[in-house]
Amino acid sequence: MLKEFKEQRLNEIQELRSMGIEPYPYKFEKELTAREIREKYDYLQAGEVLESEKLSFAGRVMSIRHHGKTAFFHMKDDTGRIQAYVRADSVGKEKMDLFKRHVKIGDFIGVRGFPFKSKTGELTIYVQEYTLLSKALRPLPEKWHGIKDKEIIYRQRYLELIVSDEAIERFRKRFKAVQVIREFLNSRGFIEVETPILHYVTGGAEARPFVTHLNVFDIDMYLRIAPELYLKRLIIGGFEKIYEIGKNFRNEGISYKHSPEFTSIEIYQAYADYNDMMDLTEELIVEVVKRTCGTLKISYQGKEIDFTPPWKRVRMRDFLKEKLGVDILEDPDEVLLKKLEEYGVELEIKNRAHLIDKLRDLVEEELVNPTFIIDHPVVISPLAKRHREDPRLTERFELIIFGREIANAFSELNDPVDQYQRFLEQAKMREEGDEEAHMMDLDFVRALEYGMPPTGGLGIGLDRLFMFITDSPTIRDVIPFPIVKPKKFEEEEAEFEGGFEE
């Protein structure tokens, strides 16, 4: 059982220290990764030995096969696995006995030696010396039932990363995508900036916020639901091409495509409009997909998504009229509500903005390939500039992929009088019970009164984008440490005990 296993490992540690061996030394000079070793020496033929080439490697022991005075074992680092071979006449009898007694699956060790290929053709390190680097006190999941419970994976992601090369590659792809985004924008003259996480008032999106309390001023504050209004303040202050990658927080439900804590990027460009931001969105995502997946046609959950540009652009009014037979500009609320009732949609709040939002949700599911839905009504776009050809609409787009909103962008509203009136309308909606409506932000209106140039703004939900490039069915699969319902530590330990096998 787990308790006995840990006691045995603790006894081994005590024994090592009594021998003058520190089981947790400070460093090891690792020269090559597993991938670099494979790339450098894969040309060797089966049975070929390259004793003149010395190398050092370190990683976690994933398996061991003892054969008398020799042992084969696999080690893993963050680039993959490599086999190693140790024998008594190479490291000495004392060190071989120490290896057999004290090097276990899950431990970290460093090895020095030379490469060769086994008779079966597997690239292997011939160990001439080794150093124990870290003793593991717990068995790896491969020693019990594996990881079948997704909740355990989400609570203890490190376990999945230890035993699953696929998980390592999934998150490597996520982290690489972030690098690609930064390289793409930096090469175009954008500057990465930072704005506050703690807000005095919420803004930039329609969502229920997390509330916290700042003791030093004895005031309530909010975790940001979006960085938009602070980024626009930077544009007002004189920056022209900026972006921010960071966490946002919305105190709402959890689903396969929603997380209360999520990562987004927001991008703002002075003297640009929503057409420019559409082009930028398309070019940016194409670059990310191409460099992380190697192709623009990817498989997602058994279906093909084609990211090849140019992407389709559809006006929201035309799209809903074609699919549902309603006119979101001309039809009264009663007609829109009746259409929703036909589809069995129930609404707690029945203002026009919510009616249009729910109608949109009904039809976006069928959009698989990237599609821009453009020109939203003013009532659902309080921060977007009115359309230059129809003041009932705004210059706004949403990017839909596989039925999910991935990006949202505007020609930004820079008329302070119009913005103030929109805030008043949002405040009225809050008074009527809409907790997701925007709060009045008088300081932002004041900032606009100093003048903001014509500006294009864009926000992309990165977690959802990363779901596509990693073929992950749920958003929690691409968030390293997602929010899950907590369990007591003792309960989690009992679950482990239940699956443990000696």
From Swiss-Prot:
Cofactor: Mg(2+)
Reaction(s) catalysed by this chain's protein: tRNA(Lys) + L-lysine + ATP = L-lysyl-tRNA(Lys) + AMP + diphosphate
Gene name per UniProt: lysS
Binding site residues for Mg(2+) 1: E398, E405
The protein's name in its UniProt record: Lysine--tRNA ligase
UniProt KW keywords: Aminoacyl-tRNA synthetase, ATP-binding, Cytoplasm, Ligase, Magnesium, Metal-binding, Nucleotide-binding, Protein biosynthesis
Record CDD domains: LysRS_core (cd00775), LysRS_N (cd04322)
Any single GO BP term: lysyl-tRNA aminoacylation
Cofactor note as given: Binds 3 Mg(2+) ions per subunit.
GO MF term set: ATP binding; lysine-tRNA ligase activity; magnesium ion binding; tRNA binding
Record: residues binding Mg(2+) 2: E405
Assembly, per entry: Homodimer.
InterPro entries xrefs: Aa-tRNA-synt_II (IPR004364), aa-tRNA-synth_II (IPR006195), aa-tRNA-synth_II/BPL/LPL (IPR045864), Lys-tRNA-ligase_II (IPR002313), Lys-tRNA-ligase_II_bac/euk (IPR034762), Lys-tRNA-ligase_II_N (IPR044136), Lys-tRNA-synth_II_C (IPR018149), NA-bd_OB-fold (IPR012340)
